[in-house]
Amino acid sequence: MKVAVMELRLYVPWVHSLKEKRMVVKSLLGKIRNRYAVSAAETEEQDIHQTIVIGVAAIVAHAA
């Protein structure tokens, strides 16, 4: 069994409010989850509107 964990730190200078950030984060999370079949969530910096931190995790039962 293999476990993969990744943290993505993104700077989004065009976002000027938490509402705008929420729209960007929801879109990114949906695309990541649908395309790669992994677990993903916003993990840090939730109150800072120009920084997005996304944690991604996957578990594989056997090596591909």
Task: Label each region the model flagged.
Residues 20:
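A contiguous binding-surface segment within folded domains or other stable secondary-structure elements
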